[in-house]
Design a protein with these regions (language model features):
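Short, gly/Ser/Thr-rich active-site loops of penicillin-recognizing serine hydrolases
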Residues: 248, 261-268, 286-288, 331-386
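Short active-site loop at a secondary-structure junction
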Residues: 14-22, 44-101, 130-142, 227-230
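Short Pro/Gly-enriched beta-strand edge/turn motifs at strand-loop
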Residues: 5-8, 292-299
């Protein structure tokens, strides 16, 4: 790794102050590079290292995707099976296939917000009664949550047990959990003290202590079960191992690895593009600013973006992977609702968007994904393809 790359990474956390911690790994099926910058928390003197544990947020869907296609490869599931072929409790989804579900062919909705449920049973009751509409390409966590239930029914086994058996053990992962052991919390990155401005109220989320998933729906599972869409914690050392095994076709067949990222939703309608998704992942969008996938990469690339500041890109054609983990929620303002209120709060300071509250200056990280691409993803792609 050259010094120019390191400078770009450091700019994200030192100059732009988009997060207190940034860890990055990238490479191909044989070689890897690692970068660790910043501290585990702003009030923590300990620096990040390759084994520092991050909340993966929606990168957890990568694990879900691997398990689903492993079950397909075992001949126990087909993309053409309907949801109610497997589980008739999903009373409104009898015409939707597994392929439809995984590729966001329909918009799925619950009657109430899932994060407000008090327990897993209540949440699953809402999922069993989910309804759909003919809106293609609407991103949602619900498909991953539903497929988790279906796989458990098919295999008669807990989903995370399958992750342990088919991913964690063969990849020799050492820092990947849904429930982080107490003795490893001291090397876990903080996402606590996320701030949001909602209808002129400054709200602080101060209960996301180390080991608690940022995602509200996953919190319902209380680290006991995996929700399917979020809730896994891991490190760059583990994610590097996982990506290399994936690129070597040791987890899934080459045919399936090459099929996952193919666009199945995106199209141009009345001059505007819809969103581009593969199976539970982003696929390459024609317009870079809207694309989770770098434009120099292939049409077979899979990508995942995580709310807490993570990104995973794997291109099986160019044979490269990139994984970055950051804590862009930690002691930063992440959202202003309604968006129209943004201008009355945001002030530019040293090139960064900031917000003042009670004499304290906070960095506003709503635009994190653009800074992430500029400072991490795009420079790495240039480096790997050069």
């Amino acid at each position: 790794m050259n010094d120019n790359l390191k400078k770009k990474f450091e700019e994200l956390i030192v100059d732009k102050r988009m997060a207190s911690a940034l860890c990055v790994t990238f490479g191909n099926e044989n070689n890897d590079y690692f970068y660790c910058g910043g501290r585990l928390a702003e009030d923590d003197i300990n620096k990040t290292n390759i084994n520092s544990i991050f909340d993966l947020s929606s990168i957890s869907k990568f694990f879900t995707l691997i398990i689903v296609f492993k079950v397909i490869e075992l001949g126990m599931l087909s993309l053409d099976d309907t949801i109610t072929d497997i589980d008739q409790r999903f009373i409104n989804l009898n015409s939707i296939t597994i392929g439809d579900l995984l590729s966001y062919q329909f918009e799925l909705k619950t009657s109430e917000r899932l994060e407000k449920c008090s327990n897993i049973e209540e949440l699953e009751h809402l999922l069993f009664n989910v309804t759909f509409s003919q809106n293609k390409g609407i991103y949602s966590d619900i498909p991953a949550m539903i497929i988790r239930i279906l796989i458990e029914k098919i295999m008669n086994e807990d989903f995370f047990s399958l992750i342990e058996k088919w991913i964690i053990k063969p990849c020799k992962l050492e820092n990947t959990y849904i429930n982080i052991p107490d003795d490893m919390l001291s090397n876990t990155v903080s996402n606590n003290f996320e701030h949001r401005i909602i209808k002129n109220r400054f709200i602080t989320y101060d209960h996301i202590t180390r080991g608690i998933c940022n995602d509200g729906k996953s919190q319902v599972f209380k680290n006991i079960k995996f929700a399917g869409h979020a809730g896994i914690f891991s490190s760059i050392s583990d994610m590097s191992k996982l990506c290399k095994k994936f690129l070597n076709y040791e987890l899934l067949s080459k045919k399936n690895v090459f099929s996952l990222g193919i666009n199945r939703t995106g199209e141009k309608i009345n001059g505007n593009y819809t969103k581009f998704f593969g199976y539970l992942c982003y696929s390459k969008h024609p317009i870079r600013i809207y694309s989770e996938v770098n434009h120099q990469l292939s049409e077979k690339t899979i990508a995942f973006g995580g709310y807490t500041g993570n990104q995973l890109t794997i291109d099986p054609v160019n044979n490269i992977y990139i994984f970055m983990a950051a804590n862009r929620c930690h002691n930063r303002v992440t959202q202003i609702i309604p968006k129209a209120d943004s201008n009355k709060y945001i002030k530019m300071m040293n090139g960064s968007k900031t917000i003042q509250h009670q004499g304290i200056t906070y960095i506003y990280t709503k635009d994190f994904v653009y800074a992430r691409d500029e400072n991490v993803i795009d420079p790495i792609v240039e480096y790997l393809l050069s």
